[in-house]
């Protein structure tokens, strides 16, 4: 298997990508004495209910005709491409838990990925869903076109791709629709022009606006943007160099502080860990 195509084989696997691209870890985790493989967990009924209700939110609020998942609810909302990526990862879980059938999940997944594949892209500020393979952060729930003046987002595109890859890995049968899910996922991933957003050496920008150009802020400190770097380096068509990883790691120690007591991350929100590590 091509070292970059492995991404479809294991969602977004950091270890395999790091090995294939010659990356080094930013730091080495400390060994935990007596640590072993986790055993089976029996969940509290409250947690079970929370999980199913969370699943039902995605299933019930997503536009079944095109796969657009709203950014919020119950107020009228636009779709979030990151939320769409989450939804694509949720459908297989729903099958595994017995909440929907594989046929239902397959149909919803293919509808979504096909809609995004066919969605018009271009430099125009309106009437398109993305540009150079990237998608706008927020899309109209019905047309899939850019909502308002939202940015073309590198991280939200990456989270969408993460969900697509999870789905492409899970739908592994010979069924024609499952093969199409895998094919379209690869096409969408391969057309993203990652180097275009490397406006500054070894740094990938957070995005672009057709009105003002590339955003000045970059993914260069520890936060939810790790998945952007992994996907960009692993691209089989438009890769960036491993210098973006070296730059990321060069400020790793500065991501921590002991200013207010025990050493901790400057960037503390839970999503800073969850968003990338759902897939990595």
Language-model features and meaning:
Residues 40, 44-51, 77-84, 102-109, ...:
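Solvent-exposed, acidic/flexible segments
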Residues 70-92:
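N-terminal, post-signal-peptide region of Sec/Tat-exported proteins
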Residues 52-75, 99-149:
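Helix-terminus loop motifs that line ligand-binding clefts
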Residues 5-27:
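N-terminal export signals
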Residues 1, 21-51:
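C-terminal segment of N-terminal export signals and the immediately downstream linker at the start
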Residues 45-46, 125, 129-157, 173-280:
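Extended ligand-binding clefts on enzyme/binding-domain cores
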């Amino acid at each position: 298997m091509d070292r970059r195509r492995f991404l479809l084989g294991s969602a977004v696997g950091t270890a395999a990508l790091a090995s294939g691209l010659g990356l080094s870890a930013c730091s080495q985790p400390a060994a935990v004495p007596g640590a072993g493989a986790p055993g089976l967990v029996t969940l509290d009924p409250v947690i079970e209910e929370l999980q199913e209700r969370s699943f039902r939110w995605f299933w019930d609020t997503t536009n079944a005709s095109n796969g657009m998942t709203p950014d919020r609810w119950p107020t009228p909302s636009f779709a979030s491409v990151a939320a769409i990526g989450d939804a694509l990862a949720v459908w297989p879980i729903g099958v595994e838990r017995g909440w929907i059938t594989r046929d239902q999940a397959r149909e919803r997944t293919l509808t979504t990925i096909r809609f995004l594949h066919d969605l018009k892209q271009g430099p125009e500020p309106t009437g398109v869903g993305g540009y150079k393979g990237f998608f706008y952060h927020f899309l109209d729930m019905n047309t899939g076109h850019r909502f308002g003046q939202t940015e073309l987002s590198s991280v939200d595109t990456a989270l969408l791709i993460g969900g697509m890859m999870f789905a492409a890995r899970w739908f592994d049968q010979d069924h024609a629709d499952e093969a199409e899910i895998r094919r379209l996922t690869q096409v969408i991933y391969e057309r993203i022009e990652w180097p275009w957003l490397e406006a500054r050496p070894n740094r990938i920008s957070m995005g672009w606006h057709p009105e003002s150009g590339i955003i000045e802020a970059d993914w260069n400190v520890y936060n939810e943007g790790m998945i952007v770097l992994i996907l960009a380096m692993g691209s089989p068509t438009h890769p960036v160099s491993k210098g973006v990883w070296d730059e990321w790691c060069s400020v790793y120690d500065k991501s921590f502080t002991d200013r207010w007591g025990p050493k901790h991350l400057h960037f503390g929100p839970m999503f800073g860990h969850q968003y990338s590590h759902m897939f990595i």
